[in-house]
């Protein structure tokens, strides 16, 4: 059977992929942007020179919008997954204070380190992480998902799957429009 696909790497997507990988599912994680280390350079270039990379910026890339802006990464304190999320972030380098603070705050520097650590664990568990890969279409057969159409660095390809989790950020308007049209 085809592996499950998680679309979006920040931070909900990697945490979803982690849960799947720990169950032995070996998911594929697709992210249109770049890893946080490369993305940091693109963001700095934008802030200093005004050069915008439309796929790797404050909105797109590993860690999502919250990776470069305080207050964007939130977890509801009454959410059932709250403890899992915070424990995983602490386990990957976030400050322990987020486990007991009324308004948990990770901070950009800690979040970047946690994202890199989380990515390493995902790779060790067999997750196939594909940066620079944007979902451009879906294939439905009899009303059920059978494949994702993907644009990657080497061009377009079809990724067969019957299971996909969309962990899209707030700026993936083109993807939302594509899904609505499908």
Roles of regions detected by a PLM:
Residues 1-92, 96-182:
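Residues forming the flavin
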């Amino acid at each position: 059977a085809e592996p499950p696909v998680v679309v979006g790497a920040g931070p909900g997507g990697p945490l979803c992929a982690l849960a799947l990988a720990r169950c032995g599912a070996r998911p594929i994680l697709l992210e249109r942007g770049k890893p946080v280390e490369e993305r940091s350079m693109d963001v700095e270039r934008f802030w200093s020179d005004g050069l915008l990379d439309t796929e790797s910026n404050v909105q797109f890339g590993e860690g999502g919008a919250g990776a470069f802006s305080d207050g964007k990464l939130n977890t509801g304190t009454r959410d059932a997954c709250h403890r899992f999320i915070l424990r995983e972030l602490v386990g990957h380098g976030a400050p322990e204070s987020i486990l007991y603070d009324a308004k948990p705050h990770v901070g950009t520097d800690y979040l970047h380190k946690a994202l890199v650590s989380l990515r390493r664990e995902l790779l060790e568990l067999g997750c196939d992480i594909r940066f620079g890969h944007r979902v451009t279409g879906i294939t439905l057969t009899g009303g059920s998902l059978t494949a994702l159409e993907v644009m990657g660095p080497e061009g377009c390809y079809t990724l067969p799957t019957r299971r996909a989790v969309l962990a899209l950020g707030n700026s993936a308007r083109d993807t939302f429009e594509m899904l609505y049209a499908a």
